[in-house]
Swiss-Prot record:
Catalytic-site annotation from UniProt: 86, 146
Enzyme Commission designation: 3.5.1.18
Molecular function terms, GO-annotated: acetylornithine deacetylase activity; metal ion binding; succinyl-diaminopimelate desuccinylase activity
Keywords: Amino-acid biosynthesis, Cobalt, Diaminopimelate biosynthesis, Hydrolase, Lysine biosynthesis, Metal-binding, Zinc
Binding site for Zn(2+) 1: 84, 115, 175
Gene: dapE
Pathway note: Amino-acid biosynthesis; L-lysine biosynthesis via DAP pathway; LL-2,6-diaminopimelate from (S)-tetrahydrodipicolinate (succinylase route): step 3/3
Protein name: Succinyl-diaminopimelate desuccinylase
Cofactor note: Binds 2 Zn(2+) or Co(2+) ions per subunit.
PANTHER family given in the database record: ACETYLORNITHINE DEACETYLASE (PTHR43808), N-ACETYL-L-CITRULLINE DEACETYLASE (PTHR43808:SF31)
Cofactor section: Zn(2+); Co(2+)
Residues annotated for Zn(2+) 2 binding in this entry: 115, 147, 360
Lineage: Bacteria, Pseudomonadati, Campylobacterota, Epsilonproteobacteria, Campylobacterales
Annotated source species: Helicobacter pylori (strain J99 / ATCC 700824) (Campylobacter pylori J99)
Reaction catalyzed: N-succinyl-(2S,6S)-2,6-diaminopimelate + H2O = (2S,6S)-2,6-diaminopimelate + succinate
Main function: Catalyzes the hydrolysis of N-succinyl-L,L-diaminopimelic acid (SDAP), forming succinate and LL-2,6-diaminopimelate (DAP), an intermediate involved in the bacterial biosynthesis of lysine and meso-diaminopimelic acid, an essential component of bacterial cell walls.
Length: 388
């Protein structure tokens, strides 16, 4: 089965987060030779398929056991394709049923075509066509909760794999990373994300007696240039400068003759490795010195980076250039993804997938040529890793 046929089938399942709708049974049916692990919690389902190709024979393992570095010698390279089968709600005004895929003018239309059932379909097809000659462990990790909170999705599945000593060495998450043409972008990392709530305190009172009030909005005006849209560091070759962005402001009771007793500022900082929750706290404490305030900070994800010269990145680059005739840009732009959970376990991880011009949009679609090329790239990566 090719990537197009598999992707069409995947799109036909209305897997709006966290619904799985039986899609895992279909996927399992494609891989009868793979072992299966499943994990379900709080309505979220996760699937892990794996197969050891050309396993080391027992007598060889005994010989390896005599060697100093037994662990590295006995275990074959473990590579994992990862992704999510859940999609966001389709909304209205589609030209066709979002869960009845159609082909029109060289494109496959349907919810999830780009994000990310197209990528999943491509790596499933590549996995079916992979036949290495050396010992190699190939796995596939899928979750029904990436578009949602993600608490019981990939993160939980990786914890289970750690318990079973089945964590991969390398992984590609098939997120739609490309901007204009397939192959123009690889995500080799992601910025971290810190959410915050700042409350500046004042004294509520009658607007006609300002001398008896202390308006916190006046206080905010004096420090706003130092907390709105400011760069927290200079970035580096892999990351843009970390930036503090205000997302919401709230003050007052809704009455025109009452000054507020406080003003609440919600903000987010997307940050590089140069900025941490502690350094952000220190910066704000310095800016807000001597002012009455309360501050809450919470990190929702940590930044990570996979070296541009790593084995996985190099093999992926080589196959993109060979198949797509494009030199990919290595970057860390965009929001958070499940790749961060792999990185937290020390797994070498990158993201690569379809063009992202219609993700989460009406009439989402992926070109048929993209699916064909994406499958070839993924198969080339498998073959390249198994030969090196």
């Amino acid at each position: 089965m090719d990537a197009l046929e598999i992707t069409q089938k995947l799109i036909s399942y209305p897997t709006i987060t966290p619904k799985e709708c039986g899609i895992f049974e279909y996927i399992k049916s494609l891989f009868p030779a793979f072992k299966t692990l499943e994990c379900e919690k709080n309505g979220v389902k996760n699937l892990f398929l794996y197969r050891i190709f050309n396993p080391l024979k027992k007598h060889a393992e005994k010989e390896h056991a005599k060697e100093k570095h037994v662990k590295e010698n006995v275990k074959p390279l473990h590579f994992c394709f990862a992704g999510h089968i859940d999609v966001v709600p389709p909304g209205n005004n589609w030209q066709s049923d979002p869960f009845k895929p159609i082909i029109k003018e060289g494109f496959l239309y349907g919810r999830g075509a780009q994000d990310m059932k197209g990528g999943v379909g491509a790596f499933l097809s590549a996995s079916l066509n992979f036949n290495p000659k050396t010992p190699f462990l190939l796995s596939i990790l899928l979750t029904s909760d990436e578009e949602g909170p993600g608490i019981f999705g990939t993160r939980l599945m990786l914890e289970k794999l750690k318990e079973k000593d089945l964590l991969p060495h390398m992984a590609i998450v098939a997120e739609p990373t490309c901007e204009k043409v397939l192959g123009d972008s690889i995500k080799i990392g992601r910025r971290g994300s810190i959410n915050g709530k700042l409350i500046l305190k004042g004294v509520q009172g009658h607007v006609a007696y300002p001398q008896k009030c202390q308006n916190p909005i006046d206080t905010l005006a004096s420090v706003l240039p130092l907390i709105s849209g400011v760069h927290l560091d200079n970035g580096d070759e892999c990351f843009d400068p970390s930036k503090l962005v205000i997302t919401n402001l709230h003050a007052g009771l809704g009455a025109n003759n009452v000054t507020p007793g406080s003003v609440e500022i919600a903000f987010n900082a997307r940050h590089s490795l140069k900025t941490t929750q502690e350094s952000l706290k220190e910066y704000l404490e310095k800016v807000l010195k001597d002012l009455p305030y309360t501050l809450e900070l919470e990190s929702s994800s940590s930044p990570f980076i996979t070296a541009s010269h790593s084995k996985l990145t190099s093999v992926l680059q080589e196959n993109i250039l060979k198949t797509c005739h494009t030199t990919p840009l290595l970057n860390t732009k965009g929001g958070t993804s499940d790749a961060r959970f792999f990185s937290a376990h020390g797994i070498e991880v990158v993201e690569f997938g379809a063009i992202n011009d219609r993700i989460h949009a009406v009439d989402e679609r992926v070109s048929l040529k993209e699916l064909e090329l994406l499958e070839k790239v993924f198969l080339g990566v498998l073959e390249g890793l198994s030969e090196k």
